[in-house]
Amino acid sequence: MRWISATLMLIPIVNVMHCSLELEECVIFKPREGDEAIVLPFIFRGNNIIVLPTTKYSDLMKNTENVKGFTLFLNHISHVIWSFTVGDIVYTDDNRFERLFDEKMGSYFEDLHKDILSLYVQGNGTFSGLLKIVYERIFQCKRRRNRHMSRYGSDIIKMTEDMTKLVPSEVDERKRRKLAAFLVANKKYGESLSNIARWRRIVEVEKIVCDACEKICSDLKEEELMRLLAEGSMRKALRKGLGRDKINYRLYLECIFTDIRLLSDAHKKYGGDVIKELVKQILLGKKGEEIDREYIDKVARVVQERQKREIEKSMKELLRDEEKAKSKKRGKRKSVGVSGAKEEEKKESETEEVEAGEEAEMPSVEVGGARRKTGKKSEGDQKRLKIHSRVLRWRKSPEKIKKEWDRGSEERWRGRSLEEIKEQKVFHDIVGVLELLKSPDADRFFMDTGKYTKGGSERQRMVAIGVLERGEKKMTGVVEVGMFKDSPSGCPVVYHLMFRVTGIEEMGNVVNPEFPEVSDVEKIDEDKEYQDAGKFVYPKGVKFETVKETDAFQIVWKNPSDTSEVLQSLTVQCRPPVI
């Protein structure tokens, strides 16, 4: 026999394949005393997110497989929440406690599942809103009488007392002590179910976290949300506990165990903006035991300083607009002073350019024969890289690329049509990214997904979230960089470089460390000569700049004949700050 509650949390996973709770494949957490579970309103399958806090049923309808899996998941969501927050009694001698739970809570949960499924399908609510309703219905904190939890707790106490009276006299002393300890803990567990103040606090904090998650997902652009979720996607405790093979076809929620009184106090003291930042840090992988009063105060200071900077920036822009308006009015009053007004506007424009230049972290660099602007970081600050011929190949015309691939040894590219080559050139001809990868700021943009061995060589993969814009088409995804070390110099050689279009749902797999082991090229020709990235001459019309305001690195392709025409741009997003 064993009892699982606050000291051991047994978390069941919904097996979509069999429509059942897979209790034999569960994860046991050991939270600190006083910590409670906060469930994050994201549903995962394997590495991928299939439901966001903002997801509505109409969104799920776009993917039939997700609708089926989610419906099955909702049929068990109360059991999952119960296991996270309350815990279960496991008595191995017989199933009396299991039968008691089914009798007192099981039928109630079944009715609850039907109600919330109907509410979600027929209504226009979000998943985070649905999760808040599930919490309210499970714990029934607004009821003073006839709470299902309280009645269930009373029955546990009664059953425990009966078991205490009926302990056989022939049971030896060791087993008697063990049973006595179990029954004492069991009685406390039953009593705790009537502690409405505790469950009310859990429900309140869960609502606060759900609201923060929904606001994060609503406020951020798709690429900003992707960089946030990508950063934390490899830090999921539950996925690590189950392992890759056991969880690929299962739906699960993630949670954090922490002192929820601190979150409640922080919300009262600092408000929603600080809670929102705290939840962001949790999504980035912050552990529950690391969240204390000192850390919360630190986050509050960061948020307050950020808000102060934003206010100052808004004031500067407002004053600048007012000065512009005054300048134009003065120009209209003086018919003779038209040229003077133009000169004033020109000076104003120059001032703006200077201010923008002061804000830029690294000034724009025009390459391909153009003079580099002063202030650029010296070559000594940059990392040395080499470029493999298979990467440089994409700089050539589609006809030449096809000819070389057809003669090459890589099966995946041989025999591709010219149209396919033209399409792939858009995603592979991004050598300008190496300008960022060489810089000291590379780690601010790229995540290292780790090293692996394939085809007899050790390789490394870096990824960054990006946005590729071509005409009116905007594509979000990841910039992938594959490298190995040149022998004997040890200099990194970039053999793979591309922009991979992906959405939030598939992003987990793409940034997963195991992804390149399946998708990467089997064999690399390591005997070829590699070109030094620092000596590479970029074509006319390609421009690189770091945009500090949006924390992004941008490559802009312009028409060489008309540089005012932008053909394509790639913006690499900076990684979100970890506090």
Swiss-Prot record:
Superkingdom, taxonomy of origin: Eukaryota
Biased composition (Acidic residues): 350-361
Renumbered residue ranges of the record's region Disordered: 321-384
UniProt biased composition (Basic residues): 326-335
Entry's family note: Belongs to the UPF0329 family.
The protein's name: UPF0329 protein ECU02_0080
Organism field: Encephalitozoon cuniculi (strain GB-M1) (Microsporidian parasite)
